[in-house]
Amino acid sequence: MNIFEHSIKNVDKGNVVAIVGTQWGDEGKGKIIDILSKYSDITCRFNGGGNAGHTICVGNKKHALHLLPCGVLYENNINILGNCMVIHLKTLMKEINNLGNNILDRIYISEKAHILFDIHQEIDAIQETRKSKDGNAIGTTKKGIGPCYSTKASRIGIRMGSLRNFENFKKLYIKLIDNLMDLYNIKDYNKEEELNEFYTYHKILKDKIINIISYINKSIDSKKYILIEGANAAMLDIDLGTYPFVTSSSTTLGGIFSGLGIHHKKLNLVVGVVKSYLTRVGSGPFLTEQCNEIGEYLTKKGFEYGTTTNRPRRCGWLDLPMLFYVKYINCIDIINLTKLDVLSGLKEIYVCVDYKNKTTGELLERGSYPLEDEQLREYEPVYEKFEGWDEDITNCIEFDELPENAKKYVLTIESYIKTPIVWVGVGPTRDNTITRKFD
């Protein structure tokens, strides 16, 4: 389905579609982004850094992307790394080199994106070690994301635009690194070696660093199709997620406008990606977590191991109150439900439909969400039970081919969140996706 032509048929707006994760990440955004990239002219990433990861399965080959947008897999697609990203250039160049085929010709990097240095990763590990001693570790990927955003917020960070003039970059670099070494008592850091690496990056990338705001808006005005891919997910948003167990950037709809510099009226469709069950990496509250054989089953069958860290993900039942809250804050228009096939073989499936206060027995108002850890501990999940199914659904290509219990599961989710589920993922590849009609 060409979602761009479908979505703008009766809407006098821009040709812009956004994909956002609705949970704690790892929902399977990469696959739907990959599918839709076929129809887009430009694919944009607006936030985050190498802590995110998309795994794209094309035939028997897997592509793990941490910084590059998924559009790089299509030769007709321009790919943009946005303003609010933090970019570890060693990681970026590794991804570019792994893909080959003149990928660099189709990549542009915002001059406003911040550079993530190796010292940011060292600081991340130092901070996490200190927190773990007090039992307050966040469970970060140790990719340096938080420290890089910290230097950005402190206005001492270095932006990609500075790399175009290497002599000026060198002065900024020495000042920043000396500052951070002193602040964190880092005695041994090879500045000369890193500067040599960055001189290479300067020569390779200086013409790829541009004003993306102008580029994207001119593209929208000329009726190009723009696909926006979110990294991480809504419940990891620095402001709207389960703080402090969040990432360091805005992962929700609002982050798009600063991350790419486009007007909100230019955005005409928001796709929310929902996994059929729930997972989380690292620390933080998780009301529906299953620390039992069900959790182990979901981890193994769903191959729930982090793209970035390879850590096993915590697994549990789908949480609809959370999903309803995320729909509110992202203005989600349609849903892509993923990994329904993982639930095949379970005799019973549970879905959280309400949060009940442990003391008063009152149910949480739909659309609100207690984001603080201590607030969440006041509630317990209220479940609805569904009968499972044994059939292998990976070869289903139409919704009506699904077992009745699987269809009931999907339709119940759709009814609860009052948002059409357009795509249903029934396996790992592009072809394992059921497309339903929507108005």
From Swiss-Prot:
**Localisation per UniProt entry:** Cytoplasm
**Which positions in this protein are listed as binding Mg(2+)?**
D26, G53
CC cofactor note:
Binds 1 Mg(2+) ion per subunit.
The residues the record assigns to binding GTP are: 25-31, 53-55, 62, 307, 313, 339-341, 425-427
**Coiled-coil region list:** none
Is Lipoprotein one of the keywords UniProt gives this record?
A: no
Q: Which reaction does it catalyse?
A: IMP + L-aspartate + GTP = N(6)-(1,2-dicarboxyethyl)-AMP + GDP + phosphate + 2 H(+)
**Would the keyword Hydrolase turn up in this protein's UniProt record?**
no
Question: Record-annotated residues binding substrate?
Answer: T307, T308, T309, N310, R311, P312, R313
Instruction: Report quaternary structure and partners.
Output: Homodimer.
Q: Name one GO molecular function term.
A: magnesium ion binding
- Other observations noted: Parasitic protozoa lack the de novo purine biosynthesis pathway and rely exclusively on the salvage pathway for their purine nucleotide requirements.
**Transmembrane segments annotated in the record for this chain:** none
What EC number(s) is this enzyme filed under?
A: 6.3.4.4
Query: Cofactors per UniProt?
Result: Mg(2+)
What are the catalytic residues?
D26, H54
Q: What is this protein called?
A: Adenylosuccinate synthetase
